[in-house]
């Protein structure tokens, strides 16, 4: 991509969004895609009368790609900053033109799409078939894999219980109750807004049982 850096630099726009600031909303016209430099963004959509968090996008992740297509396309999801976040915006027209002539880049994006589709299908299957405790276990293990651990061995992301519930596809009340059960069973422990996994093997067993 080195030969494309001057062209990208001429078209991109870097900016910072504040915590809880909406980057784009479900149904907004597609204007381009976003790359996350630093920070954390929740990608979410309406699911009946609830909010469902599809994934989290932190350093190096991409946003808005699902909306690429025809000129009148709209974003099928929303994106909201969970903390101060630095983004790089690239207009849709330039990005699509780049894909048409850079086959290696297009292939990498296609592989990203395929992996994301597989994760989305797993999430929908879990929502339909898996009990809340299993879905919460999946959510916690995914967060650990994406964000890693801090110096206290907690998952290195500050997250509200409401967002955790939306990521697990459950109500706040159900997740609150299930987390208390997990604490009593020594599966997890809490440190402020952060969660430590005490028994990863047991959480994995909840998913596969």
What are these regions (language model features)?
Residues 1-19:
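Short proline/glycine- and basic residue-enriched helix-capping loop/turn segments at helix->loop/beta transitions
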Residues 15, 34, 55, 80, ...:
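Residues that recognize and position ribonucleotide moieties
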Residues 3-5, 55-114, 118:
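Cyclic-nucleotide recognition modules
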Residues 100-169:
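Polybasic "coupling" helices that flank or enter modular domains
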Residues 143-209:
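Phosphate-/nucleic-acid-contacting segments
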Residues 21-83:
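Cyclic nucleotide-binding regulatory domains
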Residues 44, 65-66, 97-98, 139, ...:
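Residues that scaffold the ATP/ADP-binding catalytic core of kinase and kinase-like folds
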